[in-house]
Amino acid sequence: MTANPQRGEIWLVQLDPTRGQEIQKTRPAVVISSEMFSSIPMRIIIPVATWQPKFQNRPFMILIQRTEENCLDADSAGNVLQVRSVTTERFVRCIGKVSETVVQELVIGLIICVDYRP
């Protein structure tokens, strides 16, 4: 059975093989793809790492506070510089869901990183 990750869900995703500074291993990631593309077996994700104080001044590290709904082990950060598209075959299992507010904060972080100016 193929996974069908939805926007805002946190999934464990197999990110290997990687190169250079790409974030590695199987780790949580937030799906930010529009539901408009759910029939395509690819998703846009933002990998998640455990929050560290040094992330405070890094605009590409978006705080995701641990909640019962997201089921993260600790406060974490979405690393928007590591955004990528991956096949749904890389998705292991859903572990939780973030709020729409967190999804929007991640998207805003991505907009800042690409210097988008409407």
For each feature predicted by the language model, list its residue ranges.
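Conserved functional hotspots at enzyme active or ligand-binding sites that engage polyanionic ligands
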Residues: 1-118
